[in-house]
């Protein structure tokens, strides 16, 4: 290693410690083998949690604790340099998890392998914490007063403290007090789930991706897929895309439109005949009503159809206007017919 200082050059004459050379060599091999390197926060992480994760994640990759400077040396050896965004993140108390698994899947795996630990003052209860009835390993002493402070009924039996009945000492979301933490430790309850605090992932040696960009909100994506499914179905119905689901909805609608069009054009078929007869009867009754009003000497009587609810009798003077409007109405144009037929196919 040479360091330029003005016109002088510093040349390292002493060899690097064998331990550091070995660490750099191992890191180099891991970087060559695994495309993804997760960084996780070591601050406040107990050795028990770290060793437990090493054991649980051994099928998915390798957890290594490497000094940032040594990791950067190994990274430069493998990739020929280190991007500024990666160099900025590789500093302080960080650990490394080398893996070939999809980063989004790794986040899920880490969460599923959370490690239980004893509660500490300031922790939040993840659920209602219940101290079960039965014996404890604690001998009578000052600890009994702390049981009493938490309103846990106790008795002394066989030289040990016994819990008289199941007692809730902390509700979900409640902050753990020093008394709660000590009592839970005495009775052997570890209510807190701790996991590696992932910071992000080095993506194939090219860039650093923050953990917030990798967390997938399952419910959000479920809603997006459901919305997309509704839009896709509506589009398929509008363009009459021939699938089983679309045809099951389109064919009955097309049949109804075809029958309505045939009835409007006066085409006689088994389906249109009831509608044509009803329309003919209605038109005949309307015409008879007009004639009866203008020529009462003919003795024409018109029987109007009975309805479920009484309605006002239409004024005779309005019938000629309606008849006149009916006569002025023309049949559908060729463009309307063509448009209706096109909508069916």
UniProtKB/Swiss-Prot annotation:
| Gene Ontology biological process terms in this record | cytoplasmic translation
Its GO CC terms?
cytosolic large ribosomal subunit
Q: Where is the composition biased (Low complexity)?
A: 305-318
Disordered: annotated span: 303-345
Q: Biased composition, Basic and acidic residues: where in the chain? A: 319-332
Subunit details: Part of the 50S ribosomal subunit. Forms part of the ribosomal stalk which helps the ribosome interact with GTP-bound translation factors. Forms a heptameric L10(L12)2(L12)2(L12)2 complex, where L10 forms an elongated spine to which the L12 dimers bind in a sequential fashion.
Q: Which protein family is named in the record?
A: Belongs to the universal ribosomal protein uL10 family.
Instruction: State what this protein does.
Output: Forms part of the ribosomal stalk, playing a central role in the interaction of the ribosome with GTP-bound translation factors.
Q: What is this protein called?
A: Large ribosomal subunit protein uL10
